[in-house]
Amino acid sequence: MTDDVDTHIHEKFDLQKRLGKGAYGIVWKAYDKRSRETVALKKIFDAFRNPTDSQRTFREVMFLQEFGKHPNVIKLYNIFRADNDRDIYLAFEFMEADLHNVIKKGSILKDVHKQYIMCQLFRAIRFLHSGNVLHRDLKPSNVLLDADCRVKLADFGLARSLSSLEDYPEGQKMPDLTEYVATRWYRSPEILLAAKRYTKGVDMWSLGCILAEMLIGRALFPGSSTINQIERIMNTIAKPSRADIASIGSHYAASVLEKMPQRPRKPLDLIITQSQTAAIDMVQRLLIFAPQKRLTVEQCLVHPYVVQFHNPSEEPVLNYEVYPPLPDHIQLSIDDYRDRLYEMIDEKKASFKRIQHEKIRPYGEDKSRAPIAQAECSDTDYDTARSLQRTTSMDKNNSSSHDSSSGTLRERAASAESRTSKDSNGEMRNGNGNTPSSIKQRRRSVERARLFANIKPSKILHPHKLISNY
């Protein structure tokens, strides 16, 4: 195990256990001698073997540097060069399991865990989308969990800035996921049908697939090929109109769908049985053919399925667009990516080109403050625990009173964003007149441990039996 590691890495870390090894790398559970923390140490083999892999490595590091301070995004602690100048080491925060392995274990997750996981995923994706960035590779193995059921989103190798995608000349097809070995089971119809342009809806589709997989215990659309994947989707979701098909901007969509063999349909509500009505409704509203008709992440956060965990003060957004420091709409040389990454290692930080929005994002962020500092959340999971404790005592019939129409969800999303305001001193106040300082004091109360105990599923997850996947 240790023979594959450079000497200078051994000097920094005690390798405790190999968590996994694949064609592209190896991951250890390691002890950081300097910080005295347990980390996940990932060695990427031949990170700069070709321009495609070089660009993916570069993207992952750059986007993690920008988004890693969100409580639901995996933190990249450090980056280390390898002696051979081909490999690279990444030190991440350690997480006990990933959602893929948890689902494989069977009936580990209860309904409340699934709701809590989805709410945290929506928070993470809202943060990315507010910076105009798509993750593009959302799947259960990229959703990491700890014993407290806290979620961390990982693997940003396919993430792209929407602004950089818009730099493509009119009529030129944007790069799709076929350049990488990406899991097709979670791809949206517009990607499968080679759309000329795609939107934040690609991530929302993937989130719908993840939720469905948690509900039924297996992948919803396990296609064996691109065509088979499209067939499985079209035999399940609501039939799109001609306008819906035209809206994705694919030259092939109409002809492919017309030639598709007709098989008996099996709607989602017949596949996802023994689940809450709100859960089925959310899946149906996410798995819609036309991207513009899918729920947005803001609407998801106020949907009845997860609204019990919704707290606007715990859902930060960015007030600028995120660009990687190298052009992302063209592929550069291996040396370009490697040299820039090494410069960043030497500088201990990455520079992002930031374009300030004319209109400040919700919650009245102060432009004079550092953007990442604005985005930090303190004691996020404590407030979530409080929310859970309150909602578990509520009448179960309350959820039926929610109007699940898209219009109502939009109104709730807008209402939630207006719940906070600033006082005369510039300090944020919520709808009850509380300031962050007063809330923070309450968070430090002796009730903290008791509240966390109400959601801590460590006795259920048995994280030591699960395999992490970074």
Curated annotation (Swiss-Prot):
The keyword rRNA-binding does not apply. A motif (TXY) lies at residues 178-180. Dually phosphorylated on Thr-178 and Tyr-180, which activates the enzyme. The active site is at residue 137. Residues 362-445 are annotated as: Disordered. It is found in: Cell projection, Cilium; Cell projection, Cilium membrane; Cytoplasm, Cytoskeleton, Cilium axoneme; Cytoplasm, Cytoskeleton, Cilium basal body. One of its GO terms (molecular function) is protein serine kinase activity. Keywords: ATP-binding, Behavior, Cell junction, Cell membrane, Cell projection, Cilium biogenesis/degradation, Cytoplasm, Cytoskeleton, Kinase, Membrane, Nucleotide-binding, Phosphoprotein, Serine/threonine-protein kinase, Transferase. The modification Phosphotyrosine is found at residue 180. Its cofactor is Mg(2+). Disruption phenotype: Viable, but males display irregular mating behavior. Ciliary defects in ciliated sensory neurons include impaired extension of dendrites, and abnormal amphid and phasmid sensillum morphology. Homozygotes present the swimming-induced paralysis (Swip) phenotype. Expressed in the URX neuron and in many other head sensory neurons. Isoform a: Expressed in head and tail ciliated sensory neurons, and in mid-body neurons. Isoform c: Expressed in head and tail ciliated sensory neurons, and in mid-body neurons. The modification Phosphothreonine is found at residue 178. Residues 394-406 have a biased composition (Low complexity). It catalyses: L-seryl-[protein] + ATP = O-phospho-L-seryl-[protein] + ADP + H(+); L-threonyl-[protein] + ATP = O-phospho-L-threonyl-[protein] + ADP + H(+). GO terms for cellular component: axoneme; cell-cell junction; ciliary basal body; ciliary membrane; cytoplasm; dendrite; nucleus; perikaryon. Its main location: other. Activated by threonine and tyrosine phosphorylation. Belongs to the protein kinase superfamily. CMGC Ser/Thr protein kinase family. MAP kinase subfamily. The TXY motif contains the threonine and tyrosine residues whose phosphorylation activates the MAP kinases. This is Mitogen-activated protein kinase 15. The lineage of its organism: Eukaryota, Metazoa, Ecdysozoa, Nematoda, Chromadorea.
